Amino acid sequence: MTRHDPNRVIRPPVGPELTCRSWLTEAPLRMLMNNLHPDVAENPAELVVYGGVGRAARDWESYDRIVETLRRLGDDETLLVQSGKPVGVFRTHADAPRVLIANSNLVPKWATWEHFNELDRKGLAMYGQMTAGSWIYIGTQGIVQGTYETFVEMGRQHYGGDLSGRWLLTAGLGGMGGAQPLAAVMAGASCLAIECQPSRIEMRLRTGYLDHAAQTLDEALEIIERSCREKRPVSVGLVGNACEVLPQILERGVLPDLLTDQTSAHDPVNGYLPKGWSLERWAAMREQAPDQVEEAARASMAEHVQAMLAFRKAGVPTVDYGNNIRQVAKDAGVTDAFDFPGFVPAYIRPLFCRGIGPFRWAALSGDPDDIFRTDAKVKELIPDNPHLHNWLDMAGERIRFQGLPARICWVGLGDRHRLGLAFNEMVAKGELKAPVVIGRDHLDSGSVASPNRETEAMRDGSDAVSDWPLLNALLNTASGATWVSLHHGGGVGMGYSQHAGMVIVCDGTEAAARRIERVLWNDPASGVMRHADAGYDIALSVAREKGLDLPGILG
C-alpha cells in the first residue's frame, strides 16, 4: 500500500475529447483527478484533499485501479468504491449511477477514531471527509458562500446588517477554514486568522483567499486596527497556535467583533497542533505515539474553548463553525463548552428549511468562460434575487479558480432543477465547450445527520436520527444521479455524523435532462421533507407551496 508518492502530479484532462467511453464516466474521472490537482488538494502526494486526512482514494494502487476501471466502464455498469478502493463492477442500467461510493462507515459501537485509525493503518479504510472521497471538492470556493452567508447573518443579527469597521477573529486556514478571510471581507468585515502551518497561509495568499501575512501578533493587530479605523476590510494570516494566541489577545484586553474557529479539531491526532509543540515534533509523534498526540491535543482544545468562552462572556458574538471543538472540550472537562451555539441553528437553518444549500457546478472543458456563461444564465433564470446576483458578481471578481473552473451558488427547491436543465440545454446547443457536472457539499438541507453541526438543536429533538441521509442517498440513486456517496465522520469526526452526496452530469442529451429534472428536484425536496418532519413552520409552508407529497407529515 503506497500512500506517499511525491512524484505524482495529477491534473484532469480538459476539453471536449473523451478519455473514457462516455461523459457519464469521463466526469467522475476528471473530478477525481481534479480533487488531487496541486492547486486544489492540501497534500496531493498523500492523496489528501482537505480536512485533516480526507482522501480521494485509499492509496495510489487504488487510485490507479479506479482510473483504469472508469476508462473501461460501460453505460449499463456501476462501479462500487469501498472506502477509496474499487471493489466491484456490476451490470445495472443506463439511468443507474455509474459510481456508488461508501466511505468511512462503521457500525455505531465501533465508530471511534481509535478503531478507525487501527483500520486505516491496516489499509482497510479511508477517511473521505465530505467531498474529498466523493470527488466533488472544488477548492476553498466550495465553502466560501456558506461562510459568507453565515457572516452576513451574524452582521444582521448583531450589528444591524453593517460589518464595516468590524473584525472577525478565527483560526484554521485549511481547505475549509481557508474560506473565512475572503468570506469575511466580502461580508464587509476584516479578519484575523491564526494558522499553525505556514504552508497553508502561503497557499491562501497564492490563491487569493488571504490579503496579508503578519509575522507577529503586534503586526497583525496593527493591520486590523488600521483597517477597522479606515473601514477598509482586509484579511490577515498569523502563524501561531490558536490555543496560545487567543489567551494572549484576551490578556491585552483586545476584543474582536465576531469569533469562531475552523481548525481541524474534528481529528485530534492529525488535525490539531498541541500547545507548545513544534510542527516537526507533531509529525514525528503522530507516527511514534499517536495516543500521546491525541491526549495533548484534547487538552489544548479545552484551553482554546475556554478562551472562546471568555470572549463570549466579554460580549463577543461567538459561534462554533462545525469542527466539533466544543464536544472535545466538554469531554476534557469544560462543562460549559456548549454555551455558545453552532452556526447552523444560529444562522443557517431557515435556509435549509427552504431546501436552500450549497449547489455547485464545474466546467469539464477547463475553460473559465463556461462558468461565466453559466453565471449569466443563473441571473437570467433567477432575476429577482439581488442578494444572489451580488454574490455572483463578487465571486466573479474575487474568486480565483482552483483546478477545473467551478462555481458555488446557494439555491434551493424549485431553482436547482431549472438551472440544471438550462445548463444541459447550453451544452446541447454548443454554448458551453463541454459538459458540466452539478453537485453539492454533503452539508446540505436533507443529506446529513450531525448533532453538533447541521442537525444541532432540531426542534423535535431528532438531532441524531441518521435515517435522513440514508434516504437521501437511496433517493438520489433511484432518481438517476451519476454518482452517489454515503460517508461517516465528515466535518466533526468519527461517531458524530453521517452524510450523503450526489453529482449529476449535464451532457446535453435528452436522457440527461430527464435525470436532471428528477435528481435536482428530489434532492432539495428531501431537505424540505426532513425539516417539515421536525416541525419547522417554514419547511411545512414550502412543502405545501411546492406540492410535496408527504403523507406522514402533511397528513
From Swiss-Prot:
Source superkingdom: Bacteria
Q: What EC number(s) does its UniProt record assign? A: 4.2.1.49
Any keyword Lyase?
Answer: yes
Primary location: cytoplasm
- Annotated Gene Ontology cellular component terms: cytoplasm
Q: Which InterPro entries match?
A: Urocanase, Urocanase-like, Urocanase_C, Urocanase_central_sf, Urocanase_CS, Urocanase_N, Urocanase_Rossmann-like, Urocanase_sf
Keyword Translocase applies: no
Pathway(s) this gene product operates in, as recorded in its UniProt entry: Amino-acid degradation; L-histidine degradation into L-glutamate; N-formimidoyl-L-glutamate from L-histidine: step 2/3
A GO BP entry? L-histidine catabolic process to glutamate and formate
User: Which GO molecular function entries does the Swiss-Prot or TrEMBL record give?
Assistant: urocanate hydratase activity
Spell out the family assignment given in the record's similarity comment: Belongs to the urocanase family.
Write the protein's name. Answer: Urocanate hydratase
